[in-house]
Structures are given as C-alpha cells and as structure tokens.
Amino acid sequence: MILKNKRMLKIGICVGILGLSITSLEAFTGESLQVEAKEKTGQVKHKNQATHKEFSQLEKKFDARLGVYAIDTGTNQTISYRPNERFAFASTYKALAAGVLLQQNSIDSLNEVITYTKEDLVDYSPVTEKHVDTGMKLGEIAEAAVRSSDNTAGNILFNKIGGPKGYEKALRHMGDRITMSNRFETELNEAIPGDIRDTSTAKAIATNLKAFTVGNALPAEKRKILTEWMKGNATGDKLIRAGIPTDWVVGDKSGAGSYGTRNDIAVVWPPNSAPIIVLISSKDEKEAIYNDQLIAEATKVIVKGS
C-alpha cells in the first residue's frame, strides 16, 4: 500500500507540472484527476466494506466480539472494526506503561535496583520470582513485564508511575480521554462485560502505541529501548506474528483475561514502512476459552486489505 501511494504521488506531481507547463491541457487533466479520485474513493469504500465483512465472519466463526484498529503510519490510512468499543486491555498495558516509565525517567535510572518481597509476588511472575533475594534493575523489570508478561513486574511498573491512576493520568496528558485504569495485577484481568474498569478501545490503544513507538512521545533513544523490548516478546508467536509475512518485523504485547479475552497490540515494520496494528477480542461467557487463531486470521485480513 505504501509503495502504491508513493507511485501515485509521483504521478500526481508529474501531472501537476504538466498542467502548469501546458495550459491547453488544464481542463482535460482536471477532469481526469476528478474521475480518478472518484474511482479511488470507490475502491477504498469497497475495500473497507470487504474487510468489514471478513471481520464480521470471523466473529461468527469464533463466537467472539472483535475490535480492530490498524494505522499505516506512512499514509495515515486506517483499517478498523468496532474501533470505539470498549475491551479489557489486560496485559497489553505493560507496553504502554513501560513507555510512560521511559517518558518519566532517565535512561540511567533503568540501572536502579528495585527490591521486593515474596509477598509482593502475584500469579504468573516467571522472571521476578527468581530474583526475590537480589532484586532486579528497573530496566530488567520493565523488560520482564513487556517480554514475558510478568505480572509482578507489571505491578512494579505501576508503582513507579503512580499506580493505575498515575498511568491513566499520563495517557490523559497524551490526549487519551478513553482509557480507564483502576486496578493492579491480577484483578485488572477480570474483564466482566459492561464493567469499564481497566478498559480502552482499539483506536485509543493504537494512538498511544503509535505515539510511543514511532511518534514524539519519546526521544529516539528511548523509543529504541521500548521497541526492542517489544520485538523480544516471548508470548505472541501465535498472534499477530502468525498472520504476517515472514520478512516483516514485529514488536508486540499480548494480553489475556476472563470472558475469553485475548489481545495483541503490535508495531509492525514491513519493508519501507511502520504501520501500527491493534487487535482486541473478547467473548461474553466467563468460561469461554480464547482462540489465538482469531488474532492471526484477523491480522491476515489487515495485511490483505492494506
């Protein structure tokens, strides 16, 4: 999609120069461009309708509610489905909280050793549980939260940025008026339908992730640290990564919760581009089992539609 747009840009520039040089062709050129614009608008509309239908079919296939928001940062074109509906964000917050941590602290501060006790450990803490006696560097804790989805590391991140409300406040300063952050791990994963605590929308998360990874929310050196943590994610191989071409680079953060909640947020680098992809799915039954294949297949729809 990026390369096509670049070619169209070159064609448009050439046509514009030709119109300035040969005024006798002005009316013809203008009419041609108007027709071309209408045709392209129709093509985009048709493509959006097609992807919308495919997402709807995936919902039926997997008995799930799906939220999608993808931004092509080279063209600002988007693909979306239920972009403004709320979903429990689950562990995806860890990537954004790491971004807030980097925003509020110097790189040198990542070497600060943080100590914690056995009582601080919560369920699923595969990294922090090994270092109770010695503590861990702040940067190592952030990396454990993002790469391994370590829940105790996630709580320590929260504590370093003012708790869930401190996290929410930081996002408000970035323009996010949607995300609600209320609880620590592991309660934030309850994902009860209709409960707006610890929820956001696909569009809001995509906008925040774009700001942290390719935007100006962080200076370049800190952006690199965050994206390297995300590229090393060990929990997302069956999600967005499974739905893209093998020569694309992915940095992602997955999440899971009750009611069949399964999320994955990612920044994806195809050759010559850096689009942002956000997928969030949620089932309505508490005992529902999430299906990673839903995320992978939804990603394929995005790739095909881009």
Swiss-Prot record:
Cleaved signal peptide residues: 1-27
Catalytic-site annotation from UniProt: S91, E187
A GO molecular-function annotation: beta-lactamase activity
Protein name: Beta-lactamase 1
Residues that span the membrane, as ranges: none
Source species of the chain: Bacillus cereus
Described function: This protein is a beta-lactamase with a substrate specificity for penicillins.
Gene3D superfamilies cross-referenced by the UniProt entry: DD-peptidase/beta-lactamase superfamily
Sequence positions that bind substrate: K253, S254, G255
Keywords linked to the UniProt accession: Antibiotic resistance, Hydrolase, Signal
Record flagged with keyword Protein transport: no
Similarity remark: Belongs to the class-A beta-lactamase family.
Catalytically driven reaction(s): a beta-lactam + H2O = a substituted beta-amino acid
EC annotation from Swiss-Prot or TrEMBL: 3.5.2.6
Gene Ontology biological-process entries: beta-lactam antibiotic catabolic process; response to antibiotic
Pfam families: Beta-lactamase2 (PF13354)
Miscellaneous information on this protein: The class A beta-lactamase family has a specific amino-acid numbering system, sometimes called Ambler or ABL numbering and often misspelt as Amber. A multiple sequence alignment was used to derive a consensus sequence and then the consensus was numbered taking into account insertions and deletions. This allows use of identical numbers, e.g. for active site residues, despite differences in protein length. UniProt always uses natural numbering of residues, hence there appear to be differences in numbering between this entry and some papers.
